[in-house]
């Protein structure tokens, strides 16, 4: 298991959780360091699964497994690529989002799609409710994908090229209420930041 870097506030909690499950934890300083690549290659891994990992994974690491890296992304790609689709879908007034499981490539959230599952956004949903519910949807979909992977190669559906709505993280300037917006936009904004931001 690869987790957050040592300077991340969740490092020790995550590492202790991994050890409590009697799994191997691999420490690293940089994702492209030769020691890490060799450790992954030595494990003879078929594929790696990535969830909530906001660092770009270099090609040399992506190629260290037999079939590559698989990412669980909380949106219906190609819409809302990036690190915070949860807030963006609420702020934009979307009524549907979902989870995409896809192969990783050199860019963020642009790899071939394996599977998708839509999710209806309730009218009073917050970032927190969507985050929690999409985690459940993502786990269920990932289990289906991994079971299928045990018996056959996974499908690879190319994502279309083009400009799509971004799911990037919020900038500091975006964390303040703009009172020039409508009441509906402000209400969505508050829900989009509740409870994490």
Indicate residue ranges for each PLM-predicted region.
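One-carbon transfer enzymes
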Residues: 1-195
